[in-house]
Amino acid sequence: MSNFDVIDIEEDEFNTIYSDKLEEIKKKKLENMEPGINEIKRVYDIVLKYVKEKKRKIYGGYAWNKVLSHKKKDYAFYNETDTPDIDFYSPEPLVDLVNLCDILHAEGFKYIKGQEARHGETYSIFVNFQLYCEMSYMPKNVYNNVRFLQIDGLNITHPWFMMIDFFRMVTDPMLSWWRFEKHFQRYKRLQELYPLPKISSPLTIERYEDKGIEKIISNVMDVLSTKNNIVFTGFYAYNYYVYLTKERGNNKYINIPYIEAYTDEYRENGMELIDEISKLSDKITYKEFYPFFQFYGYNCVFYYEGIPIFYFYSSNERCIPYKTVDYVKFENTKNVKATKDKIKIGSFDFNIMQALIILVKVRVDDDTEWNDVLYKLINGFVNLRNLYLKQNKLKSYDDSVVASFVTQCLGKVISSERKVGLLIMSRLKKKKPAIIRYTPDKESSNNFNYIFPNSSGNQIKNEKCLKLVETPNKSCNDGKFKDDEDEDEDENKDEDEDNENEDIKNKKIKIKGKNKNNNKNNNKNNNNKKNNKEDSDNESESIISDGEYISEYELDEK
């Protein structure tokens, strides 16, 4: 250090000093600046009381802090000087926005404003220019079935559901990797305290009784292997990991029950595939489905005699990380043949995320018998990844087929800020409010009645909203103000009906020797029950509890 160093503190010393000084400043701000600590606490109490009464499901940083500190107090990352906003899901966020603003106004607070946030379908409430909460739209059929823990009377989204958000971040290098520094440690601690089930028994799926289905699935794979912008995930990726490790023991090849793949050109590829796949058999049909929450976009399911054989998803303006590999044909567990062709399979992180998402989907569809399969699939991915890394003396961040944090990805990306900007421009052209905003003392701001896009994941029954047709209605199922809607067009009608999807419920697969055919009439009756379900995953329940359903798999005790 020279004699003329103006700042003579070393970097390691600075980090300690800065942290301590920052806490001092936070306390002084709460004591000396407006809004003060008393006002902040009053507003928080009102927001939390409302969230409790409405049984809204909390997510985000506030929720992560709750679940971590609930199990281990020193894992809390917020302290008494922090004022984090409270994020929660709601099937009617605009109703909540108005109600909360009115309550706060009645309590005498000033400068109350509710308005759209920077990311779509999310709304913020400010009091005295400070942000206190954000509410995000979640379709009712998803909302009613999202698992949660109840902590201090609050419904906190279940840690296993939170994991999806982490993997969405990991698999979104373009837009989300800047969040790593803050979230990585949180996820590691969440994984420590609320681990996914560790399963000792291997994944096994028996062959279809109709051996022709295997042949059809193999033929569909041949068609898909010729497309350059398709990324495979799910059971095909699992078998490829088995092939990669040459493992024939506990994690052996499985009979692939159906194919799952994503594309960044959903309509173009979808139209081509309908034509090409339909030529394979006159017994092949298909159905289109709405996006499923924030998790994936429009999708199409191909069926062979009513049995799902291929799930085809839109990338939903996300860039999907992938690895290019040799195309290996897995017609059944014994007929495995490598080719010289190349295909793309999802990165390890993407495959885990997809399985976690489908766990939510089968819960929404009240088809929890698939839980066992999906948890075993996740365990298989992890075990095979670890085996491959051990065989090749690699780390998970080293470049390999099973690597994490993959930057190579497929798809055009659009940021949430750009989406909101384009939405504002579209509204202005229609002479509509640029931003949905509500202030209790301005009645003119009350006059909005907004219809959210259908993201229920249900089948598209309104022909005007089909995407895989010659001339699709591009604006169908866009968010809109009610007076924009055509009188003869009810785009969201499927969202409030009983979920009658046949995409997963009709899977005729044997697992552990049990025939998994489902009776359609029984499914409809079950759906009437499930849409009224609001069950909590309390700690007194088994770790594998899923509402009333207890899965069959065995857990290794930790």
Which role fits each region the language model picked out?
Residues 1-45, 151-218, 439, 456-479, ...:
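N-terminal regions immediately upstream of nucleotidyltransferase
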Residues 17, 21, 46, 103, ...:
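Charge-rich, solvent-exposed alpha-helical interaction surfaces
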Residues 40-94, 98-99, 216-265:
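Active-site nucleotide-donor binding segment shared across nucleotidyl transfer reactions
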Residues 51, 135-208, 308-466:
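Active-site and adjacent loop segments of nucleotide-processing enzymes
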Residues 55-63, 67-68, 78-82, 132, ...:
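Compositionally biased low-complexity segments enriched in polar/charged residues
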Residues 93-107, 265-281:
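Amphipathic alpha-helical segments
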Residues 103-144, 276-320:
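Conserved catalytic core of two-metal-ion nucleotidyltransferases
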